[in-house]
């Protein structure tokens, strides 16, 4: 299936590892022109080199801390200076730290607000003028199944990702007349470094093996396994494509069936 992404300019935030990196590979495979940003400049450079080697596609590398509002504008300006426009934006960011409400400080909340919600708002606001002018755009937010079913011990993530979903739903209606589509992907448990860290932290708290924690999680997943980041990326790339031309304002779980609700 031709997804109609050849030659489209795609900006992927937090693109040096995990779901972001898998999405970058999938977009490059479709012939998109890539720009990647991440805090870790060395990791970002290595990711870009791997993509270029695998797919023969040049990658614009943009070190950027998404929680710092002063860095997002110049990052997007660099994409526009190189490519002239942006067709696809994948809003992805590392999740906020775990923990119950009693352990969270005001600073924890402020950092999570900037990283999880405002990074998506600011990056989107920076690319929207180009998308609206060309009357074609795809914005895909990478969230979590916690927007459908809160995950214990993830107070910050559960709260702020719901804010992203509400913002995205509202924005989708505002920009639909300009053929800019806004959707959110809600992954389930996926084999990323962040999930590995969460498993290790839970095992440490309970003084048990990580395998026991993983088994407890997978007992709740009908498919009985973790997702590969590439499986999430495939859905993101479809939503970013010409083929997803009548889909906007939705939250799409890609969760192995873990969400128990019917809707």
Predicted regions and their residues:
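Conserved glycine-rich cofactor-binding loop
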Residues: 9, 14-18
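Catalytic loop of short-chain dehydrogenase/reductase
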Residues: 140-164, 168-177, 189-190
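Substrate-binding pocket helix/loop in short-chain dehydrogenase/reductase
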Residues: 100-101, 108-113, 139, 217
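Alpha-helical segment proximal to the catalytic Tyr-Lys
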Residues: 129, 173-174, 245
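Short, small/polar-rich loop/turn modules that mediate ligand/substrate recognition or access, typified
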Residues: 90, 176, 181, 247-249
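Short C-terminal tail/terminal secondary-structure segment
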Residues: 149, 237, 248-263
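Conserved glycine-rich Rossmann-like NAD(P)H-binding loop of the short-chain dehydrogenase/reductase
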Residues: 30-46
């Amino acid at each position: 299936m031709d997804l109609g992404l050849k030659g489209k300019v795609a900006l992927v935030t937090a693109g040096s590892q995990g779901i972001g990196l898998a999405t970058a590979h999938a977009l490059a495979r479709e012939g998109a022109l890539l720009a990647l940003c991440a805090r870790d400049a060395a990791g970002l450079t290595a990711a870009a080199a791997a993509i270029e080697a695998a797919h023969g596609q040049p990658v614009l590398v943009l070190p950027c801390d998404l929680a710092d509002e002063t860095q997002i504008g110049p990052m997007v300006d660099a994409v526009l200076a190189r490519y002239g426009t942006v067709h696809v934006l994948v809003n992805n960011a590392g999740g906020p730290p775990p923990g119950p409400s009693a352990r969270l400080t005001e600073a924890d909340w402020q950092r999570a607000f900037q990283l999880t919600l405002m990074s998506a708002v600011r990056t989107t606001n920076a690319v929207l003028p180009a998308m609206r002018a060309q009357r074609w755009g795809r914005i895909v937010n990478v969230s979590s199944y916690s927007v459908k079913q809160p995950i214990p011990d993830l107070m910050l993530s559960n709260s702020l990702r719901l804010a992203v979903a509400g913002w995205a739903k509202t924005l989708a209606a505002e920009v639909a007349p300009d053929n800019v589509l806004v959707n959110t992907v809600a992954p389930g448990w996926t084999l990323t470094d962040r999930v590995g860290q969460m498993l290790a932290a839970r095992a440490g708290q309970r003084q048990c093996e990580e395998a026991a924690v993983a088994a407890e999680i997978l007992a709740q997943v009908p498919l009985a396994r973790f997702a590969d980041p590439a499986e999430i990326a495939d859905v993101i790339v479809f939503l970013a494509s010409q083929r997803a031309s009548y889909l906007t304002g939705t939250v799409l779980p890609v969760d192995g069936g873990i969400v128990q609700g019917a809707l």
